[in-house]
Amino acid sequence: MSDFIFTSESVTEGHPDKICDQISDAVLDALLTEDPESRVACETVVNTGLCLLTGEITSKAKVDYIKLVRNVIKEIGYEGYRAGGFDANSCAVLVALDEQSPDISQGVNYADDVNDDLEDNTGAGDQGIMFGYACDETPELMPLPISLAHRLAIQLAKVRHEEVLNYLLPDGKTQVSIDYEKGLPVSINTILISTQHNPEIDGITNEEEIRQRIKEDLWTHVVIPATEDLKIKPNISKTRFLVNPTGKFVVGGPQGDAGLTGRKIIVDTYGGYARHGGGAFSGKDPTKVDRSAAYAARYVAKSIVKAKLAKKAEVQLSYAIGVAKPISILVETFDTGVISQANLTELIKEHFDLRPAAIIKEFNLRNLPKKMGGNFFRKTASYGHFGRRDLQLPWENVEEKAAKLEEASKIFL
């Protein structure tokens, strides 16, 4: 199918599930900052007036979890009259954390394929499959639908924080539908923005008048700035623009819906444009291959596309708990590759070390939280883990690796 419409969504940092992702990753940052060897599997639940922190943690670090949780909620914007019914200062915070199972830790500490190579000694923290993807639709080598959805969500949060639109509240979602012809993006079919807001705007209380005001403001202050540097731009007369289709969005955040860590895995990755192994990222230390190997798979896929060995690349990795080396490596280029997929797989095995300890070392994952002032993984917990123009993420830095791949591939041309 070469002509189609593809749709992806994003959510703001005030979405209930994203509150949870950010809290879980803030806990991870705090623990790794004090103890880089911390083992963390932290889950968060939010609901009306409640935040529950649970999971398994083994660490020498001492963290004031209640204070940390309240600070994250406050920084997102849920405080006082701007809280929209959920307040960092008054919500109950419950902490129910255990230590990591010794049966799991022994497999991570002492890999099944242990030998004299130290990086063979750290086994994968669980079994599983992970996918990485890249394509040449955008400068950051991401699919256009999810890239644009994130741009809109980031700009929506920005105009709220800066009080350009002072009636906005923290919860919000974006969705973008792109027209494709012959497999290439050609136009923006539909933009949908749902944003929480005050019940009254500058004296306006009529529901339809409020929605029209928000729609006009969002086009001017969110859509236009978020897309001004794109080759494909929205057209006010052709692009369908939907805002708060139910009519109003006053009750939101945890007051409106419960939130859980790990429920926005498609938002976190490629917007449904590529396959997903099912594992969430947030709240997991780097020994969990759900996270670290997914970063590595993106690194491999992006390197392939950057080296112009394919226009699209999807990489699947699989692991067994307690075993260092991947069980399997698969690359798919969707008939866009300049060399065979078998040759690409050979290059991957030669140029990428995909053992958990090697991935952790390559990206410095244990030490980045301290290096970044205690705030690294939390920044990835909203607006996507890949293709971030606003963050310096090591798995996105592929210039050197792509150059090596390009040179090495010449023997197959």
From Swiss-Prot:
Mg(2+) binds at residue 17. L-methionine binds at residues 56, 100, 257, 288. Pathway: Amino-acid biosynthesis; S-adenosyl-L-methionine biosynthesis; S-adenosyl-L-methionine from L-methionine: step 1/1. The keyword Magnesium applies. InterPro entries: ADOMET_SYNTHASE_CS (IPR022631), S-AdoMet_synt_C (IPR022630), S-AdoMet_synt_central (IPR022629), S-AdoMet_synt_N (IPR022628), S-AdoMet_synthetase (IPR002133), S-AdoMet_synthetase_sfam (IPR022636). ATP binds at residues 15, 171-173, 248-249, 257, 263-264, 280, 284. GO terms for molecular function: ATP binding; magnesium ion binding; methionine adenosyltransferase activity. Residues 100-110 are annotated as: Flexible loop. Its EC number is 2.5.1.6. It catalyses: L-methionine + ATP + H2O = S-adenosyl-L-methionine + phosphate + diphosphate. The keyword Amino-acid biosynthesis does not apply. It is found in: Cytoplasm. K(+) binds at residue 43. Belongs to the AdoMet synthase family. Catalyzes the formation of S-adenosylmethionine (AdoMet) from methionine and ATP. The overall synthetic reaction is composed of two sequential steps, AdoMet formation and the subsequent tripolyphosphate hydrolysis which occurs prior to release of AdoMet from the enzyme. This is S-adenosylmethionine synthase. It comes from Prochlorococcus marinus (strain MIT 9312). The lineage of its organism: Bacteria, Bacillati, Cyanobacteriota, Cyanophyceae, Synechococcales. The gene is metK.
